[in-house]
């Protein structure tokens, strides 16, 4: 599970490197999707199942929402400090609950409500500019909004995956994400794409490769350990992101980000712990 967290943290760091080198978000998404599409297609071929599934409208919706969320998340990663962008992504349980309530008629228990309360409190701490502390996050509101929009998209995608899980093979659900992302990114962004030079090819390739490393580690972890243990280990991604931000981008965590991020992660942990 540490491998999974490291994979996702390195993926985010490479997204930031690519963005700072001038690569547009849609080109970074296309590079990731190209790698993921090849691996996902091979996985369905290995299982000897059709990659296109039966419930194509739901599968298409999952892919499209995931694509829109990824645009927001990657934009936030490029323009916000790496640790803060990662912390804001952990607010997705709020949105997962809302969408699950609307789409699946799932009621919230006390642990989930506590998770939401702590997440909102954590957001207030991170975003409050007049805390009286010398070190506040002082994050650009537009990219904070994009990060939260990305978390909302992730929440909606999780609900669709939950709805699709008993209907389709997991490999088919995974396949549709890059299947929608790649053509969407090409159609919307090809005019702005720039030709990579030298090591930039490896940076773009690395985004896709480390995404798969993260996914592989997560899948293996879920197969070997309880879900609560797996998710608890996934929080290692936050200090890893902070360390990578400090080493490669000269970023440091503010006091408000540490306090607010701790509340958000505590809420997510309580929510997960209650379900195991």
Write out the residue ranges for each language-model feature.
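Juxtamembrane helix-entry segments on the extracytoplasmic side of multipass membrane proteins
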Residues: 22, 30, 52-55, 128-152, ...
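Cytoplasmic-side transmembrane-helix entry/capping segments in multi-pass membrane proteins
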Residues: 1-3, 54-64, 108-121, 143-144, ...
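Transmembrane alpha-helices of multi-pass small-molecule transport proteins
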Residues: 21-68, 153-157, 176-191
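Helix-helix packing/entry segments at the starts of transmembrane helices
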Residues: 85-91, 164-180, 215-247
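C-terminal transmembrane-helix exit sites in multi-pass transporters
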Residues: 93-117, 239-258
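Transmembrane alpha-helical segments that form core, pore/gating elements
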Residues: 133-193
